[in-house]
Amino acid sequence: MVKTILIPTDGSDYGKTAIDYGIYIAKKLAAQLIGLHVVDVGLMQGPVFSDISGSIGLPPYQEFLPVIEAGLNERAEAILKAFRERCEAAELYPEARKAIGIIDESIIEAGKKTDWILLAQRGEHFHLTKGSILGSTAELVVRKSGKPVMVTPATYQDIESMALAYDGSPPADNALKLAVSLSEKAAWPLTIICITGDQAVADKLHKKIEAYLEPFQIDCETIMIRGQEDREIMKFIREGSVELLVMGAYGHNRLRELLVGSTTSDVIRKSKIPVLLTR
């Protein structure tokens, strides 16, 4: 099912937690871990530094470039060494790779040859992200990657049970398949939550779920909840009854997201447990 998991790592505290989750899940699923550190090409090009150096009479930026490149490469090797050591301490022997480029694009490209991407909710440059519309690296990877993406929070806890947020959309159907497969493989009990104020819709969703689950022998329950999607999902997470949430990503169109916001983005940013997303 899941043979390879890509873990982008930047040495941040959030990134270290992502590695711990990767180790735990790799053992559960017998998967190979691949660590990736992306040297941000923006730091190497340094347009801001170039402008400043010229205006205050410092030597041209090009004279500093070899020193900057050497420092970034040295740091990359140290981060990947720490990744390998963390995995090897848990008796896992990962691959470790370095790339130079735009961070989200490099992650997506590397992820094409893996089954999952697992990355931190926030990275080293969280406060320097591109703004609320485009969002964080995690959101960009979820939106653009064709692979399941697990986004991990600040702190680690073992996963013993999981929930699926289900609304009947095509991404949610894919998430249902993924959640059931995971429940079988990892023996995690599954709670499916459907959030709607329409009883007819609730009945339709329940029948659809039951029909899909019929061939499977897993520990599963379905709960119908009235309310607003993002609020009820976050409330369910805060109750602490599960340690992993699975959901379909960006099930609505971009115009609706711009007007009323995206449940996916809201959950990615605020969740205190890992969120596994699929398109």
Regions found by a protein language model. Give the residues of each.
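Aromatic/hydrophobic pocket-lining residues that form π-stacking "cages" and hydrophobic walls in ligand
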Residues: 18, 22, 83, 107, ...
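Ordered, amphipathic secondary-structure segments that act as subunit-interaction surfaces
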Residues: 72-82, 86-92
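A short, acidic, amphipathic alpha-helical segment used as a generic capping/interface helix at domain edges
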Residues: 210, 228-238
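A short acidic, glycine-rich active-site loop
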Residues: 58-75
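Short acidic loop-to-helix transition motifs that present clustered carboxylates
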Residues: 101-104, 227-231
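Gly/Ser-rich helix-loop-strand patches that form or flank binding pockets
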Residues: 15-17, 21, 27, 96, ...
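Small/aliphatic-rich secondary-structure junction motif
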Residues: 1-63, 144, 157-224, 242
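A short helix-to-beta-strand connector/capping loop
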Residues: 87-98, 214-221
